[in-house]
């Protein structure tokens, strides 16, 4: 059974489907953080057009965030999962085995990320919201000029939309 996580954001809602069998540790971390309200009121601190939107850092700096396992945890990279297009859900990191709470959604194919970032899901619905996020005005550090944030993230129960 796939796990879905729904996000209500300042720009609309989207839902992601987690690849539990491909990246079990990453998916457990992500779903547990969402369930605990960890992602609520967290901004999208980095948005790069035609590349990706990134969030998951409660400090909003791009340098914070921790996992349910303590500080950082190892990659779950699979050769059969690639950043082939828009809507890929992947962990942000600062090098091998440095996963915490930050994640991104691709806006286009990003093959240079293959083998470097754990892919653990995809956008199931609301991709237009993600695409609109990718068009917001940003400053020189790729930070949105007007705040874009997650209002609420939650695990979708079976049978619920």
From Swiss-Prot:
One of its GO terms (cellular component) is catalytic step 2 spliceosome. InterPro entries: Cyclophilin-like_dom_sf, Cyclophilin-type_PPIase, Cyclophilin-type_PPIase_CS, Cyclophilin-type_PPIase_dom, Cyclophilin_A-like. It is an enzyme of class 5 (isomerase). Keywords: Isomerase, Rotamase. It catalyses: [protein]-peptidylproline (omega=180) = [protein]-peptidylproline (omega=0). One of its GO terms (molecular function) is peptidyl-prolyl cis-trans isomerase activity. Coiled coil: none annotated. Its EC number is 5.2.1.8. Residues 1-155 form the PPIase cyclophilin-type domain. One of its GO terms (biological process) is protein folding. PPIases accelerate the folding of proteins. It catalyzes the cis-trans isomerization of proline imidic peptide bonds in oligopeptides. Belongs to the cyclophilin-type PPIase family. PPIL1 subfamily. This is Peptidyl-prolyl cis-trans isomerase-like 1. The gene is cyp1.
């Amino acid at each position: 059974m796939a796990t879905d996580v729904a996000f209500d954001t300042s720009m609309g809602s989207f839902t992601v489907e987690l690849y539990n069998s491909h990246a079990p540790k990453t998916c457990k971390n992500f779903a547990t953080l969402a369930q605990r309200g960890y992602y609520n009121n967290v901004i999208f601190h980095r948005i790069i057009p035609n590349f990706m939107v990134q969030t998951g850092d409660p400090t909003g700096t791009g340098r914070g965030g921790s996992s349910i396992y303590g500080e950082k945890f190892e990659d779950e990279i699979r050769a059969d999962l690639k950043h082939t297009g828009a809507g890929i859900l992947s962990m942000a990191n600062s090098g091998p085995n440095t996963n915490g709470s930050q994640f991104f959604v691709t806006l286009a194919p990003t093959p240079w990320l293959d083998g470097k970032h754990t892919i653990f899901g995809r956008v199931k619905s609301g991709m237009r919201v993600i695409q609109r996020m990718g068009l917001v005005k940003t400053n020189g550090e790729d930070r949105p000029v007007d705040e874009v944030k997650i209002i609420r993230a939650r695990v979708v129960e079976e049978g619920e939309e």
